[in-house]
Amino acid sequence: MHSPSRAACATDPAAADSAALADTGANTRPSAHPFDHLSPQAVLDALDATGLRGDGRLLQLNSYENRVFQVMLEDGGAVVAKFYRPGRWSDAQILEEHGFAAELAAAEVPVVAPLVLGDGQTLAHALIAGQPFRLAAYPRRSGHGPELDQPDTLRWLGRFIARLHAVGEQRAFVHRRTLDAQTFGHAPLARLLDADLIPPAQLDAWRSTCQQALALVDAAFAAVPAQPLRLHGDCHPGNILWRELVETQGDSSGPHIVDLDDAVMGPAIQDLWMLLSGSPDAMRGQMAAVLQGYRQFRRFDVRELALIEPLRTLRMIHHSAWLAERWSDPAFPPAFPWFGTAGYWGQQTMQLQEQIEAMGAPPLDLDWLD
């Protein structure tokens, strides 16, 4: 019931159903997307305008939400240039993300923070083929993913995230979102239903199951008086860069945060539960190790453990809406060919039914924390 695949929120349910996507209308998209304008020369020109002169070598990195490039510079250095998805965030929201990163860096919490550009700002603007873009540049950092099967690694991550939260609780975001049942559950559900892309044969079962699951999410959030704080928001292992001493170039070794694009206000447990996988017994041991480290730097409210499965449920629903809303981006259909198929929605219904069962079971038992 607590398999690692549920954290991923979407797997290929039935490749044979890919043809059904045409019947949903989900594969229709404009002939041009704003990111289509980001030619190599356009990327280099935009960076050049900020004072970062590329030598002509660049490599597009793996990112679906934004477009990210490693760019070699004339001075022998390298940066990672991030072009934000047009229309997703405002300047104020991005600057809150950058400000949070700067606060973390000032508190010596390892984070790959955006560079201050030639005009003294971390956020730049470029007009490319009539399309406005927001962009930022980051130092290039190497490393690898954390070894989550090691208790010492989990304890280290607990200490690291507690330090991040100690900074996060000092003030609130004003412009960025709050992770709650409305923003990440009910609103995505409404958008999916309005999009009219779920095949009729799967619609009633999925909608009914989703509504039942959200009723349990609502009840869980009402029962746990969690104090929201600034979070990483998407703290899965892929967003944690583990750096060894030989790789640090003067930085600290251990975990580094590399992406605050999804930073939100929310409960502390949101930045912890995605480190867990396996059976309930396995997750209990993993969370015990994480919290042994976490509580060295910050108090943890054990009642938030009851939000793990509700938060997993919100992530599943939000992920489906995210795919639907990004389908006009040419990068998405080849990467997620199963999305929108009858098999996909059937699998989502089954996974939501599993979540209903999981939310009805007792939360992780870590009574020793009281």
Residues covered by each model-derived region:
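A cross-family kinase active-site recognition segment
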Residues: 146-204, 228, 336-338
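ATP/Mg2+ or Mg2+-diphosphate-binding catalytic cores
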Residues: 321-370
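ATP-binding glycine-rich phosphate-binding loop
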Residues: 50-72
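ATP-binding pocket architecture of kinase catalytic cores
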Residues: 74-173
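A glycine-centered beta->alpha junction motif in the catalytic cores
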Residues: 86, 120, 131-148, 189-198, ...
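Active-site activation/catalytic loop segments of kinase-like enzymes and analogous catalytic loops
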Residues: 268-299, 315-331
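Juxta-kinase regulatory segment immediately upstream of eukaryotic protein kinase catalytic domains
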Residues: 2-12, 17-54
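Active-site acidic catalytic loop and adjacent metal/ATP-binding pocket
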Residues: 65-76, 80-81, 114-116, 215-272, ...
